[in-house]
């Protein structure tokens, strides 16, 4: 059975990069009729918080990325919080030590820092110098008796090559002499990502690992651990990272926001999944797709090796497409029942068909509810100046035209054209701004049908002031 996984650390809120990794793993599993697993990697005791843990799970559920195995689901391979798996890791540490494939390291952080500095100054890549690699049993006991707490290092074999096939990047080769012995247990007894991540993937039956390319150099180390313990090895695929438009790491200055913030601002889950699924993955269809359709079209071979550039406008495009396809009940659940309650029942259908194609967020709906049923709205400085420059006569003639022709916009515009000898923008724009406060938006003729006649009169009179 094919099984992919998403294993976030609960040290912060979920961001777009996390969400895309989760989505790709979900789509990959669904495309193969496989299992999507969630594991919480909370070994960083100081930074891991339960609020972040629950928030990550809430965000995944909101995105409809339901896991079949993990917290609150099938827990047959659990526990799925690494903080509860230390006894498992300790057992494998013991196996490695007994096989002389791991050894205690008493080097201080200062010693390691100095060693790296010397290596860099000599033009060599920084790696562990092997200071504690050959300590005798007596030397080890002496250091422990002195109260020194050792870390545990994996003994990397000399003069070998670690080779693996990456589904995105092809064959990868790493010289073990460039890796150096690495820490698999900290001096305080806790397990670093490198070790427990690999152990858990093997024990939980993960067959495929899709993760960011920043983990590429971790893979040979994890392969060495799994091979030493004779544990199954997953297939790896390292995906390109998301960057800003300028090619630098994605950040808030590029307009990137966390999933919770996007949700709170009215973004819809299907908009995010349609955007993220195409961020570094090619789809032939440019239509809004369901999660099932996205999964059907997902192919690891369609993942790009090049960094995926974040584009806020593209995200907003998919948001608008998603809003436009919402069933009416879902639309009002998203926009808010308090807005729906402000619309007279006899005008609800016309309002929805008129406004829906022109809104992207609940705040947009609120704006047009106020335009159609509110008393006043604030104009921007440039709009106020345009109305003043248009002159009172325009609005006086418009006032009279509405009295004469009612809500027939074509007749009103023809009247203005005849009386004022106007055409194009000068003919239409002042009327739209005076009545709606916006230069663009839904079809004006339909908005006028929705508005009360008194509202139209009042706004034309205000434009004369």
Curated annotation (Swiss-Prot):
Keywords linked to the UniProt accession: Aminoacyl-tRNA synthetase, ATP-binding, Cytoplasm, Ligase, Nucleotide-binding, Protein biosynthesis
Reaction it catalyzes: tRNA(Glu) + L-glutamate + ATP = L-glutamyl-tRNA(Glu) + AMP + diphosphate
One of the GO biological process terms: glutamyl-tRNA aminoacylation
Enzyme class, broadest EC rank: ligase
EC number: 6.1.1.17
Secretion signal, residue range per the UniProt entry: none
Chain ranges for the short sequence motif 'HIGH' region as given in the UniProt record: 8-18
Chain positions recorded as ATP binding sites: 252
Any one GO MF annotation of this record: tRNA binding
Cellular component annotations (GO), alphabetically ordered: cytosol
Main location: cytoplasm
Motif window: 'KMSKS' region: 249-253
Subcellular localization, as worded in the UniProt entry: Cytoplasm
Stored Pfam families: Anticodon_2, tRNA-synt_1c
Coiled coil feature spans: none
UniProt function note: Catalyzes the attachment of glutamate to tRNA(Glu) in a two-step reaction: glutamate is first activated by ATP to form Glu-AMP and then transferred to the acceptor end of tRNA(Glu).
Entry-linked NCBIfam families: gltX_bact
Family membership noted in the UniProt record: Belongs to the class-I aminoacyl-tRNA synthetase family. Glutamate--tRNA ligase type 1 subfamily.
Subunit structure: Monomer.
The protein, known as: Glutamate--tRNA ligase 1
Species the sequence originates in: Coxiella burnetii (strain CbuG_Q212)
Gene it is expressed from: gltX1
């Amino acid at each position: 059975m094919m099984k992919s996984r998403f294993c976030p650390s609960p040290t912060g809120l979920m961001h777009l990069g996390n969400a895309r990794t989760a989505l790709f793993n979900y789509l990959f599993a669904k495309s193969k009729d496989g299992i999507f697993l969630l594991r919480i990697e909370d070994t960083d005791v100081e930074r891991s918080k339960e609020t972040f843990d629950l928030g990550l799970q809430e965000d995944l559920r909101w995105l409809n990325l339901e896991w079949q195995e993990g917290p609150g689901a099938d827990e047959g391979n659990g526990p799925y919080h690494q903080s509860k798996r230390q006894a498992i890791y300790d057992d494998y540490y013991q196996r490695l030590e007994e096989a002389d494939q791991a050894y205690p390291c008493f080097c201080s952080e200062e010693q390691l820092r100095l060693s790296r500095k010397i290596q860099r100054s000599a033009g060599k890549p920084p790696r562990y110098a092997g200071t504690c690699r050959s300590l005798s049993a007596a030397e080890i006991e002496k250091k422990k008796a002195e109260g020194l707490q050792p870390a545990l290092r994996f003994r990397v074999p000399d003069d070998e090559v670690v080779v693996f096939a990456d589904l995105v990047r092809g064959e990868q080769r790493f010289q073990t002499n460039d890796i150096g012995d690495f820490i698999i247990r900290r001096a305080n007894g806790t397990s670093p990502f490198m070790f427990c991540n690999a152990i858990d993937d093997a024990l939980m039956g993960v067959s495929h690992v899709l993760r960011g390319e920043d983990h590429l150099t971790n893979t040979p180390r994890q392969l060495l651990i799994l091979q030493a313990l004779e544990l199954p090895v997953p297939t790896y695929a390292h995906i390109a990272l998301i960057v800003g438009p300028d090619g630098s790491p994605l950040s808030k200055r590029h307009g990137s926001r966390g999933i919770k913030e996007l949700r709170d601002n009215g973004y819809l889950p299907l908009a995010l999944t349609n955007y993220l699924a195409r961020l570094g993955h090619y789809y032939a269809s440019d239509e809004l797709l369901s999660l099932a359709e996205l999964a059907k079209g997902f192919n690891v071979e369609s993942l790009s090796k090049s960094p995926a550039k974040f584009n806020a406008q593209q995200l907003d495009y998919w948001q608008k497409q998603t809003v436009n396809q919402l069933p009416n009940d879902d639309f009002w659940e998203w926009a808010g029942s308090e807005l729906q309650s402000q619309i007279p029942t006899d005008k609800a259908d016309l309002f929805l068909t008129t406004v829906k194609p022109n809104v992207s967020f609940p705040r947009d709906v609120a704006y047009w509810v106020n335009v159609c049923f509110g008393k006043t709205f604030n104009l921007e400085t440039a709009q106020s100046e345009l109305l003043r420059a248009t002159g009172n006569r325009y609005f006086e003639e418009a006032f009279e035209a509405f009295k004469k022709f009612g809500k027939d916009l074509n007749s009103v515009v023809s009247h203005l054209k005849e009386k004022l000898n106007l055409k194009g923008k000068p003919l239409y724009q002042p009327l739209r701004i005076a009545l709606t406060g916006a230069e663009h938006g839904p079809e004006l003729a339909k908005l006028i049908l929705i508005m009360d006649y008194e509202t139209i009169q009042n706004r034309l009179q205000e434009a004369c002031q």
